[in-house]
Swiss-Prot record:
InterPro entries: Ser_deHydtase-like_asu (IPR005130), UPF0597 (IPR021144)
Annotated organism of origin: Clostridium perfringens (strain ATCC 13124 / DSM 756 / JCM 1290 / NCIMB 6125 / NCTC 8237 / Type A)
GO biological process: L-cysteine catabolic process to pyruvate
Entry GO MF terms: L-cysteine desulfhydrase activity
Similarity annotation: Belongs to the UPF0597 family.
Name of the featured protein: UPF0597 protein CPF_0803
Amino acid sequence: MRELYLKTLKKEVVPSEGCTEPIAIAYAASIAAEHLKGEIKEVNIYLSKNVIKNALGVGIPGTGGVGIEIAAALGISIQKSYKKLTILSNFTEDELKKAKEIVDKNIINIKQKNTNKALYIEVELLSETSKAKVIIEDTHTNVTLIECDDEIIMDNNSEVSEDLEEDYKLFKIADIYNFAKEVDFDHIKFILESAKMNEKVSEEGLKGDYGLQVGSKIIQKGNFNLFSNDASNKIIAASAAASDARMDGCAMPIMTTAGSGNQGIACSIPVAQTARLLDKSEEELARALVLSNLVTIRIKKHMGRLSPLCGAGIAGATGASCGITYLLGGDLENINYCINNMISDLSGMICDGAKETCALKIATGTNAAIQCANLAINGISATANDGIVAKDVEETIESIETLIQNGFKNVDDTILNIMLEKKKNNK
């Protein structure tokens, strides 16, 4: 399992600039634009409901705008698909100007795709003489089709890309814990970059007026503040501030986990902040981050790549709580307690799209992560008498999947309908 865990971390913990759903749209649009011949006359974008939900209201870095249209137009303008999830980094003023001109032409059409896939992106570009189509499925960079003028340039079976993901359900918590504890430090040093990168965004969020300013107001000095300036609130503030900045379009890269920047923030910053407060070594931090990220990835596999439940607040924060428990000296039993406590606490947190208020959910999740780690390290755990918690922690995690599949079937549709109706009424 050692090589599988390392391969997974390198595949799932990767940098991105901005929210991953609109970036994936930009990525697909960029590929299509690179193949199209002639001047673009029409842009048709077909998206799964989950992608629409997560791309509709989120800030696009460096544009001052939000949403799908400007993201797609930037992808068309930039045409640097080799950058994948960093495609929106360091674009020029001319590229932004061209993107805004595309938006202003009102040639971008967005439609919901009738598909069972949570993550589906199809971009079709038309000129007077040419047509190019690109499809991304299942994960944010998994291109399954490139077609130009009825010629298939690439046709990739999306199921192949899921081979590794299918293994994620085999990631038992005991195995993850033992790997994090015993793996050679040299093999996991790379994971430290996730904390370093995300804490830079946190610092920017704390000093800037981003979003709701959730993070900066928690530790605000001078005026009356209900929050005391204690260790836990510093950790919560640092975590929320990174999301404040990211969701308001801060043009800085973030290290994602399992396809989400907010999940990357949620599972890395609380762990890094705790390690610093406890004066832990880089090796101890790396091991805690490995544990946190792999637990997040494991839980996310049961939730789905995109989900009606909040991945950052549930999976990411649970990963963070495990990492914090580890740094506090917890063993496998304490880690199991921690997971049971977290799922008992946060399992009902919905995902109502990517937007500025995600920082509130990260603040809530981080607070729970600290609280549940504190309980776990003191030998206190939710039990099989408590709701969806099971005697075996593996069953507790699996209950999240059952909850989503059987209990949340119509939640995404309901949330998206509310969002679209609101947008229509605000026009």
